[in-house]
């Protein structure tokens, strides 16, 4: 792997090579600290992927381990350590994670060209919705702790 950290522009250019190895990819987004610029020596690489479900399901039939090799493919093409890569599948993630990807993410690849705009329109939450989700999560944690006598 290289010592040089690739720029967003370099990642966008390199991402065009992904389709040969991930033919069901519709969108790739960098999010988290690398997208916001709040990085440190231990920062990982958070990527969100959106797949064409039909193509993905057909591909998985012949390549059952395909989902597990995505970090390796991204690491190889972007020349970054695959152990530092986290993948979120936007087809199956929580509303809150999808919101943060839509709010803070940097699109590296999308097909068709307005996929990220459509995604943002679908998943961006209002402050009221975020507070409601956070309240529900806190209540769930409190209930769990009470059941365990903590």
From Swiss-Prot:
InterPro entries, from UniProt?
NT_sf, Polbeta, TA_antitoxin_MntA
Q: What class of enzyme is it?
A: transferase
The sequence motif named GSX(10)DXD motif is recorded at 32-46
EC number(s) for this protein? 2.7.7.108
Q: Which residues form the active site?
A: 44, 46
Obligatory cofactor(s): Mg(2+)
Pfam families hit by this protein: Polbeta (PF18765)
**Outcome (variant: residue 44 to A):** No longer neutralizes HepT, no di-AMPylation of HepT
| Cofactor detail note | Mn(2+) works as well as Mg(2+), Co(2+), Ni(2+) and Zn(2+) work less well. Bind 2 Mg(2+) per subunit.
UniProtKB keywords = ATP-binding, Magnesium, Metal-binding, Nucleotide-binding, Nucleotidyltransferase, Toxin-antitoxin system, Transferase, Virulence
- Which GO-annotated molecular functions does the record name? ATP binding; metal ion binding; nucleotidyltransferase activity
Q: Which reaction does it catalyse?
A: L-tyrosyl-[protein] + ATP = O-(5'-adenylyl)-L-tyrosyl-[protein] + diphosphate; O-(5'-adenylyl)-L-tyrosyl-[protein] + ATP = O-[5'-(adenylyl-(5'->3')-adenylyl)]-L-tyrosyl-[protein] + diphosphate
Gene3D superfamilies listed in its UniProt record? Beta Polymerase, domain 2
The record describes its quaternary structure and partners as: Forms a complex with HepT, probably MntA(1):HepT(2) in vivo; can only be purified when both 'Arg-102' and 'Tyr-109' (or 'His-107' and 'Tyr-109') of HepThave been mutated. The fully di-AMPylated HepT homodimer is not found in a complex with MntA.
User: What NCBIfam families does UniProt report for this protein, alphabetically?
Assistant: MntA_antitoxin
Q: What else is known?
A: Part of a locus that includes subtype I-D CRISPR-Cas genes.
The family database entries (PANTHER family) matched by this protein are listed as:
NUCLEOTIDYLTRANSFERASE (PTHR43852:SF4)
> What does this protein do, in the record's words?
Antitoxin component of a type VII toxin-antitoxin (TA) system. Upon cloning in E.coli neutralizes the effect of cognate toxin HepT. Neutralization is mostly due to di-AMPylation of toxin by this enzyme. Successively di-AMPylates HepT on 'Tyr-109'. In vitro will use ATP, dATP, GTP, dGTP, TTP or UTP to generate a mono-modified protein, but requires a purine nucleotide for the second modification reaction (ATP, dATP or GTP).
Q: Quote the protein name from its UniProt record.
A: Protein adenylyltransferase MntA
**Organism encoding this protein:** Aphanizomenon flos-aquae (strain 2012/KM1/D3)
């Amino acid at each position: 792997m290289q010592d040089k950290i690739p720029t967003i522009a370099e990642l966008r250019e390199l991402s065009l090579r992904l389709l040969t190895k991930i033919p069901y990819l519709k969108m790739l987004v960098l999010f988290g600290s690398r997208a916001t610029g709040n990085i440190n020596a231990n920062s990982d690489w958070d990527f969100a992927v959106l797949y064409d479900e039909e193509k993905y399901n057909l591909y998985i039939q012949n390549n059952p381990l395909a989902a597990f090799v995505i970090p390796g493919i991204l690491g190889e093409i972007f020349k970054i350590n695959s152990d530092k890569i986290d993948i979120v599948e936007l087809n199956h993630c929580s509303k809150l994670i999808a919101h943060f990807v839509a709010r803070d993410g940097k699109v590296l690849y999308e097909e068709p060209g307005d996929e990220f705009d459509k995604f943002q329109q679908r998943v961006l939450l209002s402050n009221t919705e975020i507070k409601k989700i956070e309240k529900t999560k806190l209540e769930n944690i409190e209930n769990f702790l009470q059941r365990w006598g903590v």
